[in-house]
Amino acid sequence: MKFFNDNGIYKVSRISGPLHNYLGLVFSDVPVADVDVVAIKLDAKEPERLRSKEVLKQVLAGAEHSSRVLSRPYNIKKVEFVSGDSLPEEIYFHLTQAIIERLHTEGENF
């Protein structure tokens, strides 16, 4: 996995053989009721494999789990993903955990 901090958007890309996934997260100091979800379409011809609602569900579950384990709230403000990336959506639970764990241990050196 490769991690990036792009002006406060914490990003991870994962490529494993033919499978590929991208996730970008923006965090908030306070809980956010209406999380902004951006489904990026890289190619107009590429089918949308991922559903925004399901990706958001997995991201929020991953953030809740990590917040509980790390005893610190991680509130999601914005989610970015590529709509044509690989299934299953459950990978976004794990990608969220990976971003939060790295942010928790590396801080500004993310």
Residue locations for each model-derived region?
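Accessory interaction regions appended to the cores of large information-processing enzymes
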Residues: 1-110
